[in-house]
């Protein structure tokens, strides 16, 4: 075989391998959940002896989301957003605590998770439509009540991004939120998959844009967080978080305006604060929303 032909075959093989690696990363990170998972059994608020109803929620791109409303005794609502590919029941612990403190609580399942319509996952880029649709449904069902957002991991990032530009939102608490998903993707490629970044991150994002229309680089909570001010922000992050390093929380805090607070939890991993010390965690979160929504969200007459 001639040298030019050998070089050509080598280049072609390398390109094919690179394309396959990009496809594998995309599939592992953003693939749809299998039907067996989407249809899995789940806990409901009834298992916590809490009354609830299902809200009709339809996103701008025509996806129906499983959504629970736990009616409270105060004229204020806290919307709880779970993590990436999370289950709606994941947030029932903190949701029940907020409900017992008098708040109405809304929990929902992201697109592509159990009970909601199937759709590709986009690490928050398209999921912002989900939270906006939930806020619309709350307005339709309960009227213009003050709303606080509590989000975990991707849910925290989405809560910051949506809350920054939605005047219906009076306060945001974000636990283990990432500052921007591109940095997070590059970190995971480098440290967890041992792959070069951004050599693979850029084509993976391009593949996502072609398949879902989501432009991950345009979803940057760290660029939006300053617009929350003067509404209060509470950031919670464990300093042993291996999924979203605590530096993400520090970046968000540095970019935010006042009033803001960063609660760093020593030795705690990803979204582990609630489980590390339920009493302290619940007290801190409820106190935050008491102060943020207190005047507007007093007891109903």
Task: Report the location of each language-model feature.
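Short beta-strand/loop motif that positions the catalytic acidic residue
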Residues: 228-229, 235-237, 241
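Conserved alpha/beta-hydrolase "acid-adjacent" motif
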Residues: 242-248
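Alpha/beta-hydrolase active-site loop
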Residues: 121-142
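Hydrolase active-site cap/lid region
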Residues: 161-217, 223-226, 231
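An N-terminal hydrophobic leader/cap segment in hydrolases
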Residues: 6-58
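The serine-hydrolase catalytic nucleophile loop
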Residues: 84-97, 110
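Conserved alpha/beta-hydrolase
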Residues: 98-117
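Catalytic histidine-centered segment of alpha/beta-hydrolase-like enzymes
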Residues: 268-282
């Amino acid at each position: 075989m001639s040298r030019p032909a050998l070089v050509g075959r080598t280049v072609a093989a390398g390109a094919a391998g690179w394309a396959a690696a990009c496809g594998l990363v995309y599939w592992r990170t953003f693939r749809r959940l299998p039907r067996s998972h989407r249809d899995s059994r789940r806990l409901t608020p009834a298992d916590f002896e809490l009354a609830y109803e299902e809200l009709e929620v339809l996103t701008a791109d025509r996806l129906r989301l499983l959504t629970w409303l736990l009616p409270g005794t105060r004229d204020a609502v806290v919307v709880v957003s779970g993590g990436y590919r999370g289950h709606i029941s994941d947030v029932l612990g903190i949701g029940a605590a907020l409900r017992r403190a008098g708040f109405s609580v809304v929990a929902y399942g992201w697109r592509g998770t159990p009970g909601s319509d199937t759709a590709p996952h986009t690490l928050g880029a398209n999921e912002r439509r989900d939270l906006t649709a939930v806020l619309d449904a709350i307005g339709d069902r309960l009227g213009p009540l003050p709303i606080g957002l509590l989000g975990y991991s991707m849910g925290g990032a989405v809560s910051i991004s949506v809350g920054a530009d939605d005047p219906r939102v009076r306060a945001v608490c974000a636990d283990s939120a990432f500052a921007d998903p591109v940095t997070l993707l590059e970190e995971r490629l480098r440290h967890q998959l041992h792959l070069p970044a951004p050599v693979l991150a850029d084509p993976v994002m391009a593949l996502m844009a072609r398949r879902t229309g989501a432009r991950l680089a345009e979803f940057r909570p760290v660029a939006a967080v300053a617009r929350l001010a003067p509404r209060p922000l509470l950031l919670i992050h464990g300093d042993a978080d291996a999924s979203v390093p605590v530096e993400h929380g520090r970046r968000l805090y540095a970019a935010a305006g006042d009033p803001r607070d960063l609660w760093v939890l020593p030795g705690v991993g990803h979204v582990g604060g609630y489980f590390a010390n339920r009493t302290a965690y619940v007290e801190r979160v409820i106190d935050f929303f008491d102060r943020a929504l207190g005047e507007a969200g007093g007891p109903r007459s």
